[in-house]
Amino acid sequence: MASFSIRAARPEDCSDLLRLIKELAKYEDMEDQVVLTEKELLEDGFGEHPFYHCLVAEVPKEQWSSEGHSIVGFAMYYFTYDPWIGKLLYLEDFYVMAEYRGLGIGSEILKNLSQVAVKCRCSSMHFLVAEWNEPSIRFYKRRGASDLSTEEGWRLFKIDKEYLLKMATEE
């Protein structure tokens, strides 16, 4: 059984965070879309006004990965607001390296996130899961998550930077 600890990410973890972000993107067959740099992660998460918060799962040296990594999982989150229900914790990314799955690491990260949400008086935790990612869907549903796309019919949209710039400069 793996021994591990969950802790808040530190600035020196940014290279591991970027590695895990890229691993998650590869798992989702979207690795070409990761353009974020380690420098941006550092500035955006550890400056005076962080845009995100992050928990990491760390294993002791004797359990490091075959590539020599001690950080084996992470959850990136931030706080947002819903005018109907108030404060929310939004889970942006959540990933545990394949060789460390099934050891309770993901459950412990989610438990820690739940404690953060409760402490900050959040009404709920929101997140996205790819439709094809049945293992994750089952993981969340076992813990009480509801699928808003089927239950409430919500659709997710995005406006890319190109169109933001266009709208921002329209007269």
UniProtKB/Swiss-Prot annotation:
An annotated GO cellular component: cytoplasm
One Gene Ontology term of the molecular function aspect: spermidine binding
Gene3D superfamilies cross-referenced by the UniProt entry: 3.40.630.30
Binding site residues for acetyl-CoA: 94-96, 102-107, 133-136, 140-143
Keyword rRNA-binding: no
Family assignment from sequence similarity: Belongs to the acetyltransferase family.
Protein name: Diamine acetyltransferase 1
Organism: Gallus gallus (Chicken)
Gene: SAT1
